[in-house]
């Protein structure tokens, strides 16, 4: 027997669960929303509050100040902020050049420029908030194995914990950059390889970071260090994202710890004293992957399935959250006017509202690394003057920070 659901979200990662929370809060109570995830989801916890389990090697995500505003609007920020590391200052520099700039949260009357959160804590907090909300049906482990667009909706077939056939008014595809469902629907992707790899790890320094995030551009590629909460024993931790040529990344993934620390020290310098430890190292190839279509009648492609970005500016997840916020508002307005949620004009309205934000964020993340890696001496001087000039031109610096923090986008019409 075929069941009906107004909205089906395919993908229960951080974007999918955030989307479920947003829609659960903004759509009428009679709206049936399903979340389908291929891996087993955590079970509800008594009291609804997850426990924080610190780990030196925990992977992390940088949330912009704009993302904080979105999570506050969803009502989940109070839970999240128990175990976050605020970014009070951002230091941007260019190795071997004189240009640099400092950005301070206090200059903008913000509590922080952003926050670094461990993925395990973020995921646990969001899923428990979804259980407490009680508006979304979770189907896990299960997978959408067939999706056929029909008049008025999408016919879905699920396999896994619950084998089901569902007629969905709206299908939201949020199953990641390598989305199998996107491919199954015949939505093409545009991929641009950067011919670089990202090396990620957590590192320990002798000195505390004092809430400062570092973005250091080098001729090999950018080095980003994000402040993390201290590990057990008070170890001063930072999350490293190091962009490198594939062969260089491969070597540094496998080399002895002492050699790795020496190489990173030479690239980053001694702003945090001597490097003392590196945790588990991981690497992956970098590419800009964009869905050629984000909306069709009855379908929206979201998160990394829609646009997977270069990590240099940490904008991918924050852009996805802004997409979530705007889609929630557009669908709420459609429901209020009794317009079908999957109507193509409704979905085009969402895409039109987000297009400028998406284009600007993608272009910023795409062009920035190449700009700082080019060795042309005239261009190098212009880069130096540009970084130094941000400190000399407060209005330009404020606008730059507003966009980097995701605040400019969400204060425009159509945003939270």
Task: Show the residue positions of the predicted features.
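Conserved Rossmann-like nucleotide-cofactor binding loop
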Residues: 15, 41, 178
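FAD/FMN-dependent oxidoreductases across multiple families
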Residues: 248-342
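N-terminal FAD cofactor-binding segment of flavoenzymes
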Residues: 53-95
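Conserved N-terminal helical subregion
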Residues: 80-184, 192-197
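Conserved FAD-binding catalytic core of PHBH/FMO-like flavoproteins
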Residues: 71, 162-165, 170-274, 278-281
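N-terminal Rossmann-like FAD-binding beta1-loop-alpha1 element of flavoenzymes
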Residues: 5-35
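Glycine-rich FAD pyrophosphate-binding loop
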Residues: 24-59
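C-terminal helical "tail/cap" subdomain of flavin- and related membrane-associated enzymes
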Residues: 329-416
């Amino acid at each position: 027997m075929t069941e009906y659901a107004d909205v089906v979200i395919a993908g229960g990662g951080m974007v999918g669960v955030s989307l479920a929370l947003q829609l659960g809060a903004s759509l009428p109570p009679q709206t049936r929303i399903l979340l389908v995830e291929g891996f087993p989801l955590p079970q509800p916890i008594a009291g609804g509050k997850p426990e924080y389990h610190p780990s030196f090697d925990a992977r992390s995500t940088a949330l912009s100040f704009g993302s904080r505003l979105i999570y506050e609007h969803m009502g989940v920020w109070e839970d999240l902020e128990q175990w976050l590391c605020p970014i009070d200052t951002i230091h941007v520099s260019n190795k071997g050049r004189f240009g640099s700039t400092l950005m301070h949260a206090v200059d903008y009357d913000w509590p922080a420029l952003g926050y670094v959160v461990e993925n395990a804590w973020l995921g646990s907090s969001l899923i428990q908030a979804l259980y407490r909300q009680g508006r979304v049906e979770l189907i896990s482990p299960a997978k959408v194995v067939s999706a056929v667009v029909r008049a008025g909706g999408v016919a879905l077939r699920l396999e896994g914990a619950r084998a089901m056939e569902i007629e969905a008014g709206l299908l939201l595809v949020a199953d990641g950059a390598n989305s199998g469902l996107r491919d199954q629907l015949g939505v093409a992707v545009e991929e641009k390889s950067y011919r670089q790899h990202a090396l990620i790890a957590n590192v320990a320094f002798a000195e505390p970071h004092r809430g400062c995030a570092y973005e250091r551009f080098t001729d090999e590629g950018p080095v980003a260090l994000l402040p993390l909460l201290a590990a057990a024993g008070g170890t001063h931790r930072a999350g490293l994202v190091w962009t490198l040529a594939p062969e260089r990344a491969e070597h540094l993934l496998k080399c002895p710890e002492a050699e790795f620390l020496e190489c990173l020290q030479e690239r980053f310098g001694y702003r945090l004293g001597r490097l003392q430890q590196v945790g588990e190292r991981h690497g992956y190839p970098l590419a800009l992957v964009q869905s050629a279509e984000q909306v069709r009648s009855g379908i929206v492609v979201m998160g990394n399935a829609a646009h997977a970005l270069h990590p240099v500016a940490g904008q991918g997840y924050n852009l996805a959250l802004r997409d979530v916020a705007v889609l929630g508002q557009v669908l709420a307005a459609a429901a209020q006017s009794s317009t079908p949620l999957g109507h193509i004009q409704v979905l085009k309205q969402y895409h039109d509202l987000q297009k400028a934000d998406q284009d600007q964020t993608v272009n910023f993340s795409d062009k920035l690394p190449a700009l700082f890696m080019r060795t042309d001496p005239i261009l190098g001087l212009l880069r130096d003057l540009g970084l130094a000039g941000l400190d000399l031109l407060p209005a330009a610096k404020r606008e730059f920070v507003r966009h980097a923090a995701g605040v400019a986008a969400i204060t425009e019409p159509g945003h939270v």
